[in-house]
Amino acid sequence: MFCIQCEQTIQTPTTKGCSFAQGMCGKTAEVSDLQDILVYALQGVSFWAEQGRKVNVILDEIDQWAPKAFFATLTNVNFDPERVIEFALQAQDYKQQLEETVRAAATVTNTELDELSPAAKFELPTEADQIIALAPQAAVNRGHETQHEDVIGLRLLCLYGLKGAAAYMEHAHVLGQTDKDVFTEYHQIMAWLGTDPTDLGELLDCSMKIGLMNYRIMEMLDTGETNTFGHPEPSQVNVKTIKGKCILVSGHDLHDLEKILQQTEGKGINVYTNGEMLPAHSYPELKKYPHLVGNYGSAWQNQQKEFANFPGAIVMTSNCLLNPNVGQYADRLFTRSIVGWPGVAHIEGDDFTAVIDCALAQEGFKHNEIEQMITVGFGRNALMAAAPAVVEQVKEGNISHFFLVGGCDGDKSERSYYTDFTAQAPEDSVILTLACGKYRFNKNQFGDINGIPRLLDVGQCNDAYSAIQLALALAKEFDCGINELPLTLVLSWFEQKAIVILLTLFALGVKGIYTGPTAPAFLTDNLLAIIQEKFDMRSIGNVEDDLKAILAA
């Protein structure tokens, strides 16, 4: 195996990347290799999907399936080798279907097709042991023996950025949002990466294309969520537990949460959100259910202890999943969609009867805890509605600076930086936050500035779109560029969704972003220097020094 896609990957003076029997995330070498094979097979699918555009052959089923399958290879999503093989064999079938259809259409129209890429030539056998033997051909760092390390690093930046974008494409698709132009660009980029490109300039340009494409995808996802569930509105959420039977919903999929709420009505079951599902409590069409009672736990890296202590059924709708056998709750865990763990029950379709039966069979919480409320729901509409008041407070000198502090959380001790940063931020500053990094500080008290809360929870990681809209509105109001605003982004990264959001911000021209806790291992020192120079990206350091530098600028 060789995997270097997440922040927790092995980094020593002599080794970068997980290359032993098991990755730091818990996936086995077998699963890692199978995921590489799946990705390479998907690049072959995209080759033929791109060729199909030349002869007006577009198969919607394949367009919608391909990003979903790619999502299955994202960090902490699918650890089940059988499921990954199923995806890979389906990719092979779809590639053959596309090839036959496209070649036939090209013959009729006398259209010349491109020479087959290495990924398009990649063929899978049907037996598992024969499939795994192909792993060296499909390794994400293939060619590293002869190619410059900067080439490999930029290929991976593009691959991992596109993987994050694919995840958001699937989230949007679940809510009925697709875009043919986005599918076309996705296939173009995926197919091109399957040619093993070597030009550094073209690879850098590709990363910016991915960032801009993801901006459109985040807009689609925002549309899907608000059209389906209404616009988020500031709402109080209880972060303590209530007596009764219970179901915990984790991941990102609001559609699944809605189905669970509908199917548990009148059954005496309390439903809790976990992790990135916290913003659900601010959507009118979700918070209307009285048995959506609160948010349980914290960020994903704490789930093995928190899930073990949860006396009910647990549904994992997307990333991030950890080994459930550690806390001995695998028999109460259910996976959905692209998520998988060997031996854990998987729910196909929208029937959650098995989850409900499991919840009713568990003890549930035996008493009520004393309520503790936090506020969520400062989505796009809420932020835009507050913009005039915010502008007034800035002009009157009551608000001096804005910080966007958030992103993916993780278990490294260095991540306490984000807790300390928000605690030490000036009292006349406003802090926007999103994604699970918020759990580092979202239960702390920050007060308000003349009625404007100092901590504004924007939502999930993809709701960076809402924060961008606020920044654009403020820039217009103050007649300046985004980079001239008293606004600083302080981001934490862990996996590929964070990578693509960073690429989106770069592509939109946002500079001076602070990132941490460590730099991506797949980026060489030379590439980091290029990115730092081009985008003024900065690594987090000492909180006091960073704040001093930010406020002095």
Swiss-Prot record:
Organism: Aliivibrio fischeri (strain ATCC 700601 / ES114)
EC number: 1.7.99.1
Gene Ontology cellular component list: cytoplasm
Annotated GO biological process: response to hydrogen peroxide
Phylogenetic placement of the source organism: Bacteria, Pseudomonadati, Pseudomonadota, Gammaproteobacteria, Vibrionales
A Pfam family matched in the record: Prismane
Name this protein carries in UniProt: Hydroxylamine reductase
Cofactor(s) needed by this chain: [2Fe-2S] cluster; hybrid [4Fe-2O-2S] cluster
Binding site for [2Fe-2S] cluster: 3, 6, 18, 25
